[in-house]
Amino acid sequence: MAYEQLKYDVLEKEGHIEIRKYAPFVMMKSGSPSYSGFQVLFSYISGYNSKKQKINMTVPVFTDVKESGYIAFTMPEEVVKEGYPEALDPRINIEKQEEKTYVSYSYVGSIKKVDTVIKILQDYVDNKGLKVQGDPVLLRYQGPMVPPIFRKHDVMLEITF
């Protein structure tokens, strides 16, 4: 099954590293990066919302790399155009994201590499004279049924020039 994927433009590419510009988008966010946070969001897209509307899953799933972070799904473009339903669960925040630029490192494998990848990105940003804004973000593209060695991930830092 193919999922709608969040669109972006690649401004620069160097090996595994890309500078990406994301157009404005809408995300639904839960304050827990764990399985329980995923379940809260999944219930929203399964119809537990103000319109009882089922919403297609999208990729990637955004997660904060901190233990006390968040998990977020992006809203499909068609649902945004038609008007998305309000969340009934108070643990869900629906947020409009403005256009943003990120430096991203893509890889396949375990999320255990995240700290190493963040260091690689930070060195890249420092060498290019870019400024980081906010905390690192981990993007996940496959679910738990895919063996970890085959899972695609992006680690991103929001940047300003």
Regions inferred by a protein language model and the residue ranges of each:
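A solvent-exposed interaction/effector surface
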Residues: 1-161
